[in-house]
């Protein structure tokens, strides 16, 4: 099939549509603080989009690049389309925010500016200002002797026009930087939050004594946060990375967010110094710095405004009284998080770190939390003399500093730490434990679609797979050898690895289903689909009658076309859990189920080390089948791609199906049923049976 730009949706505009679906959650009949969370998530997503994607397009435009995407939109065309889209959507964001705040007030939860407080609360704010804010804020004069200051990425400040009390004709421009150590809101009482800029503005004349405040405007800046590291020229990669992180703080300004109605002189002054294109200036009639709304959304006093808290469950064959290695010896085990608990993953490493029979632990780390029990267990194992090898991906965007910290801690404990492979990111999620069993060695593996991160495991849907099969032992050993040594043969036998194998394998399996015509079936769940070769292969399969169901949460570049895609159904699921699992089903392949760390994107398939894992175990395959079937039945959280490239909520007059809530209920039901069953084999069989029946 000839490549045609009309086959593809634009990557950046597709991402914007995804983020619009996130914002659309604010229109759902959710508890109010849950709706507020989606405002915060939407704005956080948009920050990163501007820092990386928009910044990248600006660089391409400056370099004179005319074509940069499969749909052949130039960088300038994309920038214009992005700005038009976001300026229009800003009105919708303001509408939802005002609606939610108004509804919160009916529930007696308020965000109030200083002037709207009663005298008692004003006195508390006054005391808070002088005890907590005044000592750490940074007042800045800007004039001939005071240059324009450095503003950190996503920094939040107050710009002021002030005049000399004795010479009012002398007008000065100043800024007050608000440090991130200060909370975005001051919780002046159990139900009242005061925006910090409102407090600072009220006390401007104490901050600039002898001057009178004329006008003020809160503003927030976004910088280019992409980081290019010349790995080939680096003798000390860790040092080069640390230097890169310092340079990132000085990235070019790419966006200015400012209060609507700000004095024209203030806006002009900021623009003059930051040189931001006027279409990248966004004026808001609502509060700025909305990612910080998590502070209010986490209010424990108003639990009735939150969704009921779900506690992930550990199901058989895992048992707190049974060694995790004994459980894996009996059978392969697949768990679906966060409905099932992440605890077995932690226990896998924790138990290995204390087991005298364990001689080696190998693991990849991409994103870990700041206080990681898993990394602490690895440190303990290394300190105890176990051979610990850890691949810490120092290039994991926005986690570089945290990963640097853990890499140093692991090295200090005696672990062998690998920083990555030149020119690639290591995105695979895999760990391997080697134990002595008599005079032989036994290998245990964990392969996953998600990170070794207990925090994200509570809010991301992912699939984990535990096995002790010999073929997985061989391939994971080879994979870690590739990471730690030199290897030109980057191919595995049972697992598939990128950059050499995964795309090749996927194209082979698509071609096989296409050869079966209307008997062919493909179901693929992932975060994003961008790769043009795979898109063309899916078109060809659809033309031949293959039924293709794609569950893609985020970016989706296959353009609907009656001629090419009539047998392709595309849906995106947005709910309280972020859909992060990659699960693939190809009816006529053997095996026919796979999980993977890789999305179908060029970066994953060509510029990262990823793994795709075949699932042979019948119970695990049945579990994945039910998982995919449930997602395809969802008519509450699901959106379907329309012929015009837009998404619409799934229309249905049938019983409401919320795939995430149903999984919570099913797992809870199984857990409750099995809680008192002490017969491990019966409990395991019943768990599998209940899951399949439900």
Swiss-Prot record:
Superkingdom: Bacteria
Top EC class, one word: transferase
Pfam families attached to this UniProt entry: PP_kinase, PP_kinase_C, PP_kinase_C_1, PP_kinase_N
GO cellular component: polyphosphate kinase complex
PTM entry text: An intermediate of this reaction is the autophosphorylated ppk in which a phosphate is covalently linked to a histidine residue through a N-P bond.
Binding sites annotated in the UniProt record for Mg(2+): 367, 397
Ligand binding (ATP): 45, 460, 553, 580
Gene Ontology molecular function: ATP binding; metal ion binding; polyphosphate kinase activity
Active site per UniProt: 427 (phosphohistidine intermediate)
Keyword annotations of the record: ATP-binding, Kinase, Magnesium, Metal-binding, Nucleotide-binding, Phosphoprotein, Transferase
GO process terms (BP): polyphosphate biosynthetic process
Reaction catalysed by this enzyme: [phosphate](n) + ATP = [phosphate](n+1) + ADP
InterPro entries per UniProt: PP_kinase, PP_kinase_C_1, PP_kinase_middle, PP_kinase_middle_dom_sf, PPK_C_dom2, PPK_N_dom, PPK_N_dom_sf
EC number: 2.7.4.1
Cofactors named for this entry: Mg(2+)
Protein function: Catalyzes the reversible transfer of the terminal phosphate of ATP to form a long-chain polyphosphate (polyP).
Family: Belongs to the polyphosphate kinase 1 (PPK1) family.
Protein name, UniProt field: Polyphosphate kinase
Natural source organism: Campylobacter coli
Taxonomic lineage from the root: Bacteria, Pseudomonadati, Campylobacterota, Epsilonproteobacteria, Campylobacterales
Name of the gene this protein is made from: ppk
């Amino acid at each position: 099939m000839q490549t045609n730009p009309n086959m593809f949706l634009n990557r950046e505009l597709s991402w914007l549509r995804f983020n619009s679906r996130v914002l659309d959650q604010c229109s759902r009949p959710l508890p109010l603080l849950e709706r507020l969370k989606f405002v915060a998530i939407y704005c956080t997503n948009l920050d990163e989009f501007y820092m990386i994607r928009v910044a990248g397009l600006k660089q391409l435009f400056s370099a004179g690049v005319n074509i940069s995407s499969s749909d052949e939109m130039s960088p300038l065309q994309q920038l214009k389309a992005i700005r038009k889209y976001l300026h229009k959507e800003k009105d919708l964001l303001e509408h939802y925010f005002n609606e939610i705040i108004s509804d919160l007030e009916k529930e007696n939860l308020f965000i109030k500016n200083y002037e709207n407080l009663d005298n008692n609360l004003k006195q508390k704010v006054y005391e808070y200002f002088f005890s907590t804010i005044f000592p750490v804020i940074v007042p800045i004069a800007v004039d001939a002797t005071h240059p324009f200051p450095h503003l950190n990425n996503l920094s939040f400040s107050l710009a002021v026009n002030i005049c000399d009390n004795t010479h009012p004709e002398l007008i000065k421009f100043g800024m007050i930087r608000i440090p991130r150590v200060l909370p975005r809101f001051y919780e002046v009482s159990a139900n009242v939050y005061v925006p910090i800029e409102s407090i600072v503005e009220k006390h401007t004349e104490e901050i600039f004594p002898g001057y009178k405040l004329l006008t003020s405007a809160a503003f927030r800046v976004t910088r280019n946060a992409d980081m290019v590291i010349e790995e080939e020229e680096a003798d000390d990669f860790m040092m080069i990375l640390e230097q890169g992180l310092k340079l990132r703080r000085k990235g070019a300004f790419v966006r200015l967010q400012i209060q609507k109605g700000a004095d024209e002189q203030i806006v002009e002054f900021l623009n003059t110094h930051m040189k931001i294109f006027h279409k990248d200036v966004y004026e808001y009639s609502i509060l700025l710095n909305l990612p910080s709304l998590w502070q209010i959304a986490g209010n424990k006093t108003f639990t009735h405004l939150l969704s009921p808290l779900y506690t992930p469950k550990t199901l058989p064959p895992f048992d707190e009284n049974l060694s995790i290695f004994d459980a894996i010896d009996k059978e392969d085990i697949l768990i679906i998080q966060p409905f099932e608990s992440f605890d077995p993953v932690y226990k896998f490493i924790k138990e290995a770190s204390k087991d005298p029979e364990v001689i080696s632990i190998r693991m990849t780390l991409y994103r870990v939390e700041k206080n990681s029990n898993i990394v602490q267990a690895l440190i303990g194992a290394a300190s105890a003399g176990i051979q610990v090898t850890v691949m810490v991906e120092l290039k994991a965007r926005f986690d570089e500093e945290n990963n640097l910290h853990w890499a140093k801690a692991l090295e200090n404990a005696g672990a062998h730490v690998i920083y990555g492979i030149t020119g690639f990111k290591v995105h695979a999620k895999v760990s391997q434990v080697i134990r002595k069993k008599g005079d032989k060695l036994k290998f245990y593996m964990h392969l996953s679609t998600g990170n070794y991160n207990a925090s994200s495991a509570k809010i991301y849907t992912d699939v984990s797979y535990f096995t002790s099969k010999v073929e997985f032992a061989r391939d994971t050993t080879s994979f870690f050898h590739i990471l730690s040594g030199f290897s030109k043969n980057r191919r595995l036998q049972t697992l598939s690895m990128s950059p050499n194998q995964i795309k090749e394998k996927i194209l082979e399996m698509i071609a096989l289903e296409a050869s079966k015509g209307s008997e062919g079936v493909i179901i693929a769940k992932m975060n994003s689909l961008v790769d043009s070769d795979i898109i063309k292969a899916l078109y060809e399969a659809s033309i031949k009658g293959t039924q293709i169901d794609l569950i893609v949460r985020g970016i989706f570049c296959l353009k609907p076309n009656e001629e090419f895609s009539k047998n392709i159904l595309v849906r995106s699921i947005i709910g309280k859990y972020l859909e992060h699992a990659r699960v693939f089903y190809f009816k006529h392949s053997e095996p026919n189920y796979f999980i993977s760390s890789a999305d179908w994107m060029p970066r994953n398939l060509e510029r990262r080390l990823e793994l795709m894992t075949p699932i042979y175990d019948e119970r695990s395959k049945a579990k994945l089948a039910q998982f995919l079937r449930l997602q395809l039945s969802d008519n509450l959280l699901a959106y379907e791609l329309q012929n015009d490239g837009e998404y619409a909520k799934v229309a249905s007059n049938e019983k409401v199906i919320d795939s995430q809530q149903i999984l919570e209920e099913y797992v809870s039901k199984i857990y409750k049923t099995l809680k008192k069953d002490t017969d491990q084999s019966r409990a395991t069989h019943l768990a599998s049976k209940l899951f399949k029946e439900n």
